[in-house]
Regions:
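C-terminal motif of bacterial Sec signal peptides marking the signal peptidase cleavage site
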Residues: 14-16
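Bacterial signal peptide processing site
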Residues: 18-21
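Sec-dependent signal peptide recognition
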Residues: 2-10
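Residue-level hotspots at or immediately adjacent to binding/recognition sites across diverse folds
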Residues: 26-141
Length: 141
């Protein structure tokens, strides 16, 4: 009985995945992960910081890499790094954050407030609307 269930499960998985791949192809030939939803991915490539919307690359000017992305009220917020500074972008406009040798690791939006969590040379911090709030007293915290 267990062998029978195994073979049935394997067949359903094999044929089910093949069917999904052909049914979920959009007009660009892409196979979306979540049908009928917009997929945002933050990262970088050889040209620098960027994000992708459903596979289409959007450049983040002046950035080295992007670490997180969130969409709020139609605006795209992305955290990352530019040179030795943490930064974030609203859509494609870059905002540098105070503190040297830092990186913005995560971003959140609450109403009109933009929060970026990250670190800088002296330890962990977060920035609220561009103002740095230290979370540590030394580099090891």
């Amino acid at each position: 009985m267990n062998k029978f269930l195994f073979h049935i499960s394997l067949a359903l998985l094999f044929f089910g995945c093949d069917l999904l791949e052909t049914q979920n192809t959009n007009e660009n030939g892409n196979n979306p992960i979540i049908p009928n939803h917009t997929i945002y991915i933050a990262g970088n490539d050889e040209q620098g910081a960027c994000y992708w919307i459903n596979g289409t690359r959007i450049e983040l000017p002046g950035g080295d890499w992007a670490t997180d992305i969130v969409v709020s009220n139609g605006n795209v917020y992305t955290s990352g790094t530019c040179g030795e500074h943490a930064c974030y972008w609203i859509n494609q406009e870059r905002f540098d954050l105070p503190g040297t040798w830092g990186e913005g690791e995560a971003i959140a939006v609450d109403g009109d407030d933009v929060y970026v969590a990250g670190w800088f040379d002296n330890g962990s911090c977060y920035w609220k609307n561009g103002s740095k709030i230290n979370l540590t007293t030394n580099r090891d915290s």
